[in-house]
């Protein structure tokens, strides 16, 4: 399946492709 962008931001970055930091969690671009 596709990434869900649910990880926590680390130093303002997200490691899932197509995701951006919406502190404290990553959201879809």
UniProtKB/Swiss-Prot annotation:
Record's comment on post-translational modification: This is a cyclic peptide.
GO BP terms in the entry: defense response; killing of cells of another organism
Lineage: superkingdom: Eukaryota
Crosslink (Cyclopeptide (Gly-Asp)) position: 1-29
Disulfide links within the chain: 5-19, 9-21, 14-26
InterPro entries on file: Cyclotide (IPR005535), Cyclotide_sf (IPR036146)
Pfam families given in the database record: Cyclotide
Record's keyword terms, sorted: Cytolysis, Disulfide bond, Knottin, Plant defense
Domains (record comment): The presence of a 'disulfide through disulfide knot' structurally defines this protein as a knottin.
Similarity field: Belongs to the cyclotide family. Moebuis subfamily.
Biological function: Probably participates in a plant defense mechanism (Potential). Binds to and induces leakage in phospholipd membranes, particularly ones containing 1-palmitoyl-2-oleophosphatidylethanolamine (POPE). In vitro, displays cytotoxicity against cultured cells but no hemolytic activity towards fresh erythrocytes. Not active against Gram-negative bacterium E.coli ATCC 25922 or Gram-positive bacterium S.aureus ATCC 25923 up to a concentration of 64 uM.
Annotated protein name in UniProt: Cyclotide mela-2
Organism: Melicytus latifolius (Norfolk Island mahoe)
């Amino acid at each position: 399946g596709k990434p869900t962008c649910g990880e926590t931001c680390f130093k303002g970055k997200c490691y899932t492709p197509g995701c951006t930091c919406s502190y404290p969690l990553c959201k879809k671009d």
